[in-house]
Structure formats: C-alpha cells, structure tokens
A protein has these predicted regions:
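N-terminal regions immediately upstream of nucleotidyltransferase
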Residues: 1-48, 53-61, 72-79, 83, ...
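RecA-like P-loop NTPase motor core of helicase/translocase proteins
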Residues: 11-15, 39-42, 73-77, 91-94, ...
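Generic non-transmembrane alpha-helical segments
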Residues: 32-41, 87-95, 173, 177, ...
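Short beta-strand
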Residues: 46, 50, 97-101, 187
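Extracellular/secreted glycoprotein ectodomains characterized by long, lumenal stretches
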Residues: 47, 53-59, 70-74, 84-85, ...
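Conserved catalytic core of two-metal-ion nucleotidyltransferases
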Residues: 82-129
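A structural motif
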Residues: 133-174
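Conserved nucleotidyltransferase catalytic core and NTase-mimicking acidic/glycine-rich helix/loop elements
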Residues: 162-285
Length: 295
C-alpha cells in the first residue's frame, strides 16, 4: 500500500500529540499548590500556564506551569530572584522538589504525571491598579523578566481560530523537530515564531511547515521582541548560531521535500525521506506494524 506525505504527517501528529483535555488536572494541581503555599505566602493570584493548557504539548514532554503571584512588599521587594525561588522551595521542604534548568521555577514532583513547575512572580500594575504584566525570576542572571502569559495564551488561541487546526499541529511538529535536533529553542520561542509566521488559514500543511522554517531561519538570527520582552535572551551566541544552522538545513530539506509532491509530482517516498521532521522513521514503524498484522 502506498504511503503518502499526508498520511505520514497524520501519523506523526498522532504519535506526538498529547490528546485529551487536561485542564481539570491542571486546575487541581494549581489549587493544591496554593494550599501548600498559602500559610507562608500572601498569594494574590494563581493560574495554570505552559504547553498543556495551550494545547501545544508533546506527549511525554509536556510541561505544566503554575504561576503564583506573590505579594510584592512581603515576598519580593529587595530580594534577588534566587532568594525568592529558594523561599518557595523551602516552603515545600516536605516534598520532592528541584530547580528548572532555565532558573525560573521550582519543580514539584508528583507520583503521577505531570510534574509542576511553580513560577513565583510579582504583579506590575498601572495607576488604575490594572495588571500590566508579571515579573518572572531568573536565578541564572539574577534579573526579573517581564511576561504576559495570559495574553500569550490568548494569542495562541486567536491564531488557532484564524489559521485553523494546523496552527497548533505545526507548533507541535516543530517542537518535536527541535527536540531531536539539539533542543536549542524553547517551546515558548517556537510558539512566538509561529505567531510571527502565520496569520491566515493554513490549509496546506507541507507548504506551511516549509514556510515556518523559511520565517524561523531569519527570525532566529536577530533578537525577537514579543509583548514586553525578548523571547530569545536565553540563547548564547554559539547556541543561536547552532539553532540557525539547523533551521537553515531544515529549510533547504523542506523545500526539496515539498517540491517532490507539488503539482504533478507524486514522489512521496522521496518527500518522506527528505522531510526533516523524521517522517521516514514514522513510515518505517507504520510498515512494521502493518507487517506484524499480516497472516
């Protein structure tokens, strides 16, 4: 049976997609964390964030963030980010915790999936006491990073409605590509790249994945501003160069792969072998499963 690029992409998405609605789990974990912290902190607000509630999560590599807005005067003022993070970790001393590699959260480990990254933040308000953004701790640089996680999540939802279901599919496929090609880009960075790249209906998945790499290879070369901060400040000079090199290779391969099945061209085998998102591996596994079922 012939295997097409469309079928390969569908199989890939099935393999990497975290299916189902996990908001109930996220909300329960959020409420439990507030319960654990409220005796030692004045918590002004807490909400779930990360790839799970945005439906951009990879199966087996999903993250759940719980943003906890602490009273600035009591818990944040005149304190280094590392100190604030440590006080949260100390408050959870009876539980197994760790520090997230980017230095912006305390990880609380659960017996069941998912673990939770607790991000203690302070709120910044205007003269009308309206929250303009949040300040996220970065213990690696001892700085506070401006962030608007709610607005970013809303932008993802708006883009998904405007561009169609392929918008989130592309994000997840690129996250998987990134994961197996050095993991140089954060998931948040990839989401922002998708927001910058797409603004209309995505009805041709192979072409639009090629276009993502076309946009991304250019955008990652320079600093990228989104909302209230640069999304790529975590990249060193060498890491940026490596990320760009991989994106340029993906761009070149994607163009050739797309052309192999464009118009009258029907060379699906060549296209599947060229696509940088490991479609050949997907088809090999699929064929093995089919063969195993044969008498």
């Amino acid at each position: 049976m012939a295997y097409t690029v469309e079928a390969a992409f569908n199989t890939l998405h099935e393999n990497i997609n975290l299916s189902g609605d996990h908001r109930d789990t996220a909300n329960k974990r959020r409420d439990r964390i507030v319960e654990l912290l409220k005796n030692q902190f004045t918590i002004l607000e807490a909400f779930s964030a990360g790839s799970i509630p945005k439906y951009t999560a990879l199966r087996g590599h999903a993250d759940l963030d719980v943003i906890v807005a602490l009273h600035y005067g009591k818990h944040v003022k005149d304190k280094l980010p590392s100190v604030v993070l440590q006080t949260v970790r100390d408050a959870l001393g009876a539980y197994r915790t760790g520090a997230r590699t980017n230095g912006q959260a305390v990880t609380l480990y659960y017996d069941t999936w998912p673990n939770v990254d607790i991000v203690p933040v302070s709120r910044v308000t205007d003269n009308n006491d309206t929250v303009t953004h949040y300040e996220v701790p970065n213990s690696r640089t001892e700085t506070w990073i401006p962030s608007r996680p709610k607005d970013h999540a809303a932008l993802i939802e708006e883009a998904s409605k405007k561009c169609g279901h392929n918008f989130r599919r592309i994000i997840k496929m690129v996250k998987e590509w990134n994961r197996v090609h050095g993991d140089y880009l954060t998931g948040y960075h990839i989401e922002v790249l998708a927001l910058k790249a797409f603004s209309s209906d995505l009805d041709d998945l192979p072409w639009q994945i090629f276009m993502f790499f076309d946009h991304a290879q250019k955008l990652v070369k320079e600093r990228l501003w989104h909302q209230v901060s640069y999304v790529d400040d975590y990249l060193s000079v060498s890491s940026r160069a490596e990320a760009v090199k991989r994106l340029e290779t993906a761009y070149t391969k994607s163009l050739s792969a797309w052309y192999a099945t464009h118009g009258a061209n029907k060379d699906h085998a060549t296209a599947i072998g060229l696509w940088p998102i490991h479609l050949r591996k997907i088809t090999r596994h699929s064929n093995q499963r089919t063969a195993a079922k044969s008498p």
